[in-house]
Amino acid sequence: MTQKVGVLAIQGGYQKHADMFKSLGVEVKLVKFNNDFDSIDRLVIPGGESTTLLNLLNKHQIFDKLYNFCSSKPVFGTCAGSIILSKGEGYLNLLDLEVQRNAYGRQVDSFVADISFNDKNITGVFIRAPKFIVVGNQVDILSKYQNSPVLLRQANILVSSFHPELTQDPTIHEYFLAM
């Protein structure tokens, strides 16, 4: 069965995710409207600016449709996408997870680091990255950086505080496709 991956495309770094999936031979749909959710099997919520993203979700009246989709289908949130999926006022509140926004510093503090995932070293690109500070019992920690979780999964939802789409390594995207 051919799967179609949707990439939320109202703000942020959606094109790099789309390009990564296309390089893997996966059909991609840029999701901008409520009816776009009807033709996809899984969704990526990309990084960007979480407050702006929330405002646009509400302005375009797709917050409820996004919530319903993310409640049952595979979803991957990177950076700001992970914030939107976590606990907090106005967030989707679908993860047993609390985050601290911009915990790794401002834009000028961005960095690249090696992290381990499934016995493989991968590159993590951290740009104004959130820190996962309260991780509930239902959440699996898949990878850490300096003893802090940076890649997590809870049921159908995968989140990273870093940007795997900004590397040439498809490891995390392949993992998401296999969920």
Curated annotation (Swiss-Prot):
It holds the Pfam family SNO. It comes from the Bacteria. It catalyses: aldehydo-D-ribose 5-phosphate + D-glyceraldehyde 3-phosphate + L-glutamine = pyridoxal 5'-phosphate + L-glutamate + phosphate + 3 H2O + H(+); L-glutamine + H2O = L-glutamate + NH4(+). L-glutamine binds at residues 48-50, 101, 127-128. GO terms for cellular component: cytosol; glutaminase complex. Pathway: Cofactor biosynthesis; pyridoxal 5'-phosphate biosynthesis. NCBIfam families: PLP_synth_Pdx2, PRK13526.1. PANTHER family: PYRIDOXAL 5'-PHOSPHATE SYNTHASE SUBUNIT SNO (PTHR31559), PYRIDOXAL 5'-PHOSPHATE SYNTHASE SUBUNIT SNO1-RELATED (PTHR31559:SF0). This is Pyridoxal 5'-phosphate synthase subunit PdxT. It comes from Francisella tularensis subsp. tularensis (strain SCHU S4 / Schu 4). The gene is pdxT.
